[in-house]
Each structure stands twice: as structure tokens, then as C-alpha cells.
Design a protein with these regions (language model features):
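Phosphate-binding site of ATP-dependent enzymes
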Residues: 15-97, 125-126
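A generic alpha-helix surface/boundary motif
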Residues: 5, 97, 139-141
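Active-site "cap" helix and flanking loop/linker of ATP-utilizing ligase/carboxylase catalytic domains
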Residues: 59-112, 144-169
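Conserved metal-phosphate-binding beta-hairpin within the catalytic cores
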Residues: 38, 103-136, 146
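Single conserved hydrophobic/aromatic residue that forms the stacking wall/gate
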Residues: 1-7, 11
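Short beta-strand-to-turn element immediately C-terminal to the catalytic PLP-Schiff-base lysine
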Residues: 12-14, 49-51, 119, 128, ...
Length: 169
């Protein structure tokens, strides 16, 4: 469905399963819209953005298959490596700049998170989504990226409050 979050209704299907998967998606929340995307096999990275500037990337390595709802919220479902060691500095920089441009183009406000995948097939990176309100628990991806940039959790929260005040007053 087009209105789900946290990959709770993300499915990877074989071509013969498309019809059933599409109909199942329409049944969730009685929606009349679904999003169908090609599957890109690759490595996933999260790019936190604070005040329009990219934080260090976080590489997400799911224990099993996709970084779906179960792998996101199940203890041990994924490893999160920040900063990533499997990606060269130039590609990290390109992804960070793309995250900043998406933040600006979508007129995001104060903080967000851009999720990317680097294709195993061709090494190109693709933006999967922008999260306008990314998770903010101490274990969430944005606070992990901020910690790698030198922010303690309380300092990140304070920075978000200060930037929010600047944007409004």
C-alpha cells in the first residue's frame, strides 16, 4: 500500500505471485493505491539529515533477506554499521549529497532520513524513500548517525528543537 510505514507491508514476490500480492495490498487498510517497484538487490544505507546537512551513513545489514518490519524491530534482526566500512568514501559522499538534495527538493523540515540502496548489479545507488519523521529512539538510525557525527542523544534532541525554533521564529 502507498500509506504504510516501517516496511510493514513490503513484499518481494516472484512474477507468478504478482496478482495475489497486488490484491492483498489493496485489502490492507482498504486502500485504493499501491506502490509497485522493481526489486534492486544490493546493500542498504540510511542517510540522516539535520538542518539540511547529511550525517554519516549507516549501513543496514539484515540478518535474513530484506530489511522488512520484522528485521527492523526484532532484536538481532539487522546489524547497523556507522560509518560503513564496505563503501568507499567517494560513494558515501555522493549518497550524502543526494540525500541533501532530496531533503531540499521535497522541502523537508529540520531533520529527516533518506534511505538508499547500492545495486549489486551495477554499483549505482538509488533513493528508496525519504522519511519525514524518522525514528527517534536511542536505538534508531538517525540518532546512531548523529552519534557518529559527535552528537549525544540529548544534544541531537536539543539541536532539533533549536533548528525547529529557527525555522518558525
Amino acid at each position: 500500500p502507498s500509506n504504510s510505514s516501517a516496511a510493514s507491508d513490503v513484499y518481494k514476490r516472484q512474477e507468478e505471485d504478482y496478482y495475489d500480492a497486488i490484491h492483498k495490498s489493496f485489502d490492507i487498510d482498504n486502500t485504493d493505491e499501491v506502490v509497485i517497484e522493481p526489486f534492486i538487490k544490493g546493500r542498504e544505507f540510511a542517510c540522516g539529515i539535520l538542518a539540511g546537512k547529511a550525517l554519516p551513513l549507516v549501513e543496514i545489514v539484515p540478518k535474513d533477506g530484506l530489511f522488512d518490519y520484522a528485521n527492523k524491530y526484532q532484536a538481532g534482526g539487522a546489524s547497523e554499521i556507522c560509518p560503513p566500512i564496505s563503501l568507499d568514501a567517494e560513494t558515501q559522499e555522493l549518497i550524502q549529497r543526494a540525500g541533501e538534495r532530496a531533503f531540499e527538493a521535497l522541502r523537508m523540515d529540520v531533520y529527516s532520513r533518506a534511505d538508499f540502496i547500492v545495486s549489486d548489479a551495477d554499483g549505482e545507488f538509488y533513493c528508496l524513500e525519504m522519511n519525514a519523521l524518522p525514528g527517534m529512539t536511542a536505538a534508531s538510525l538517525l540518532p546512531k548517525a548523529a552519534k557518529a557525527a559527535g552528537y549525544e542523544y540529548s544534544e541531537l534532541c536539543e539541536a532539533i528543537i533549536q533548528e525547529s525554533m529557527k525555522a518558525r521564529y
